Amino acid sequence: MTHPVDAILDATGLNCPEPVMMLHNKVRDLAPGGLLKVIATDPSTRRDIPKFCVFLGHELVEQQEEAGTYLYWIRKKAD
C-alpha cells in the first residue's frame, strides 16, 4: 500500500539501537499528524518500532517486509 508521506527515514544497514534512536529524532522534527516512512534492514525493528509507537503514543499505520527490508509508516501523535 502506498501512503503519501511527509518524511522518510532510511536506516538500512544500521543495527539496534541506531534505527530507533534515529526514529526518535526524526519524529521529534515532524509536525503533529505527519506521516513518516521508515526503511530498515535490522530484524529487531519488527519488535522495537511497534513498541516505540505504543510507548510514545504514535500510530503505526502499516508495516511490511520485502526481501529482508522492513517498511513502517508512522503517524506522529497530535500535540
From Swiss-Prot:
Keywords on record: Cytoplasm
Keyword Signal in record: no
Catalytic residue positions: 16 (cysteine persulfide intermediate)
GO terms, biological process: tRNA wobble position uridine thiolation
Family matches, as PROSITE patterns: UPF0033
Keyword Cytoplasm on entry: yes
Subcellular location(s) of the protein: Cytoplasm
CDD domains: SirA
GO molecular function term, any single one: sulfur carrier activity
GO CC terms: cytoplasm
Top-level taxon: Bacteria
Family, similarity comment: Belongs to the sulfur carrier protein TusA family.
Purpose: Sulfur carrier protein which probably makes part of a sulfur-relay system.
Name of protein: Sulfur carrier protein TusA
Gene: tusA
